[in-house]
């Protein structure tokens, strides 16, 4: 019996007040995934997130219960301590991807990307 569940993406936007602010767009906004399948979500920034110090400050979070979010991936592709290796991050410049190779029931929740290359 196939039991679909939802992985929800959250569209993260800084309200633009000037043309220099970075706008983040995440797709898809939701996924129907069965445990064991692969999930993939993308995040695009309106400007390159490559900082002058050589790092790219792109993070992925999972939110299961408000207001608590769990850091999964930092600086594009580094797994935070304790995050299973089925989670992976990739990308550069303006385009980034989070993949979950074999989704487990505990993975369901709201995922979002965040940049820290520029303050809002």
Swiss-Prot record:
Disulfide bonds join 43-113. The gene is IGKV2D-26. Gene3D superfamilies: Immunoglobulins (2.60.40.10). Residues 114-120 are annotated as: Complementarity-determining-3. The keyword Signal applies. Keywords: Adaptive immunity, Cell membrane, Disulfide bond, Immunity, Immunoglobulin, Immunoglobulin domain, Membrane, Secreted, Signal. V region of the variable domain of immunoglobulin light chains that participates in the antigen recognition. Immunoglobulins, also known as antibodies, are membrane-bound or secreted glycoproteins produced by B lymphocytes. In the recognition phase of humoral immunity, the membrane-bound immunoglobulins serve as receptors which, upon binding of a specific antigen, trigger the clonal expansion and differentiation of B lymphocytes into immunoglobulins-secreting plasma cells. Residues 75-81 are annotated as: Complementarity-determining-2. Residues 21-43 are annotated as: Framework-1. Its main location: secreted. GO terms for biological process: adaptive immune response; immune response. Residues 44-59 are annotated as: Complementarity-determining-1. PANTHER family: IMMUNOGLOBULIN LIGHT CHAIN. This is Immunoglobulin kappa variable 2D-26.
